[in-house]
């Protein structure tokens, strides 16, 4: 039978110190000496102690989770992006929750609501090509959940975005065609609701 994780009170009883001392030692509080901290952490490991995530949330107002929403992992760019996001998040002790919208606006919104219920500390989102309703931005602001759009970003202002400089790229492409004598240049663009499409057209 698997041994149940210990509590702070059990660790304190074993070491004959107060529960508050154990709690501070586990959180590396400067008021606790190095020897005591090491004793507490060693006993915590021996007793299979696991921090109460709910208690941590109420104390720090953080869940150490980040939500990522993207169209599809089958696209090489997004599979590389999620890998790097997880690497950086892991370095800062954050866990990444990931959802694929498959360019379905309703599914995208469902994932956003799920992340909100899980009280993620922030959301990274690459919009699906069919997303037009951005009312969720205000919803997340009210819930004090930061949101950053990346790659496929909306036209709206006053939101955090990370995306490529498509205007400069398009101008260089057009100049390249013009330099070899082409005058009638066609553009096959993406959905009008995305900033990327607007920048390509305006270039």
Which residue ranges define each predicted feature?
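Short beta-alpha junctions and helix-cap segments that line functional grooves
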Residues: 111, 126, 135-136
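N-terminal helix-turn-helix DNA-binding module of bacterial transcription factors
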Residues: 1-64
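Bacterial carbohydrate/catabolite-sensing allosteric modules
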Residues: 1-3, 14, 46, 87-95, ...
């Amino acid at each position: 039978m698997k041994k149940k994780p210990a509590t702070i009170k059990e660790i304190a009883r074993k070491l004959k110190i107060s529960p508050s001392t154990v709690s501070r030692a586990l959180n590396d509080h400067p008021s606790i000496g190095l020897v005591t901290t090491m004793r507490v952490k060693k006993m915590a490991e021996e007793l299979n102690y696991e921090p109460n995530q709910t208690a941590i949330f109420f104390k720090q107002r953080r869940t150490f989770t980040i939500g990522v929403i993207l169209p599809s992992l089958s696209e090489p760019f997004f599979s590389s992006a999620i890998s790097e996001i997880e690497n950086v998040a892991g370095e800062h002790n954050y866990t990444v929750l990931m959802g694929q919208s498959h360019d379905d606006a309703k599914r995208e919104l469902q994932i956003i609501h799920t992340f909100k219920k899980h009280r993620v500390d922030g959301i990274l989102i690459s919009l699906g090509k069919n997303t037009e309703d951005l009312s969720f931005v205000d919803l997340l602001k009210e819930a004090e959940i930061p949101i950053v759009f990346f790659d496929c970003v909306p036209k709206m202002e006053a939101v955090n975005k990370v995306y490529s400089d498509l205007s400069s790229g398009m101008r260089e492409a057009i100049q390249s065609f013009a330099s070899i004598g082409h005058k009638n240049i066609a553009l096959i663009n993406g959905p009008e609701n995305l900033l990327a499409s607007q920048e390509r057209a305006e270039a």
